[in-house]
Every structure is written in structure tokens, then in C-alpha cells.
Amino acid sequence: MWERFPYTKGINLVPICQWLPDDRYGYRDVFDSEFLRELDKNIRAIVEPQKENRMLIGYFWTDIANWERDRNGEDWISFYQSLPADSPGGRVWQQWLSDHPSAPHGDFLAVIARQLYAEANASLRNYDPNHLILGPRYHEIDMPDHVVREVLPYVDAIAIQPTSREFNTAFFDEV
């Protein structure tokens, strides 16, 4: 079938999809070298088998990720706050706090996004330089501007999952 019909392939960069069951959902330290090795391994496993397929349009990244919303009382910020100060992400978090003492903590999401998207782009392009990177599928109600701005240098497009029954023309015009 993959040789007869155009298709896209999803790559879940971090298991923070809104629809994932609790036992598969979780934040990761995107600054940790172990996470980065796993990310590269997962991207390679998905990309290499199909990189020569002419029917492949491109790759989507994490589907409907939680960026500002919490899940079971945890979100990106509380996750980084909980990391040991000497862990890779703990050091980045502490340095960011020191450099931005009066900034809203949610601004740190841009730092997470930049790291995640830069690493994912480099890995994907290493294994497949030819197909589109369609980026993450953002949820209309959880796509912070500062996160979206960080993805733009690393993708060819982004996708947005609408949340209302009626098409939100004003929202999409603004985007």
C-alpha cells in the first residue's frame, strides 16, 4: 500500500500527546544525552525504512502535544522544576532562572522547544534530507506563540488540530 498511495509518517518526539494513556505519557529531559540518543534511535527506526519511498510526502512530529496544559498535575515547567539541580535539564533550568529572574516560568517552554526541535531536525535530516518535515500537530487550544516561533526554522510546515465544531476563522487568520 505504501508504494501506491501518498502518505505521511508520524514521529512521536516526546510521549506528551494529549490522547496517550497515562501509563505511556511522560515528560523527558530534552537536554539529557541519553534522551537525545533515544530520540535519534527512534527517528532513525521510522525514517530509514521509507526514506527512498517516492509516495512519502513527509513526517509529522508529536501529535497534539501538551505544552502549557498539565496532565495529572504535571506540566513541562513542573517537570523541570522537579529535576535534580545537577541533571542536564536541571542545570539549564537553573541557569535560565538566573538569567531571567522576573520572566514568567512559562517562557522556559521556548528553551525546551528550541532544543527538542533543533535536535529532531538534525537527526531526521541526517537520515532523510529529501522529504518534508511537516512539524508537530499543535492543538488549537495549546500552541503558545513562543513555542511555535521556535519550531519555524526546523520545519517546512505546521499542522493545527481545530477544537471547535465551527471553523475558527479568526484564530487561523491570526496564525
Task: Give the ranges of each region predicted by the language model.
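Generic structural signal for short, solvent-exposed loop/turn connectors between secondary structure elements
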Residues: 1-11, 96-109, 162-168
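Substrate-binding cleft of secreted/luminal carbohydrate-active enzymes
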Residues: 1, 53-58, 62-63, 168-169, ...
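Aromatic-lined substrate-binding rim segments of carbohydrate-active enzymes
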Residues: 1-51, 111-127, 153, 171-174
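Glycan-recognition surfaces
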Residues: 83-96, 156-170, 175
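Polysaccharide-binding and catalytic clefts of secreted carbohydrate-active enzymes
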Residues: 26-30, 52-148
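Substrate-binding cleft/loops of secretory-pathway carbohydrate-active enzymes
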Residues: 2-3, 67-71, 134-171
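Hydrophobic faces of well-ordered beta-strands that scaffold small-molecule active sites
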Residues: 7-11, 57-61, 133-136, 156-160, ...
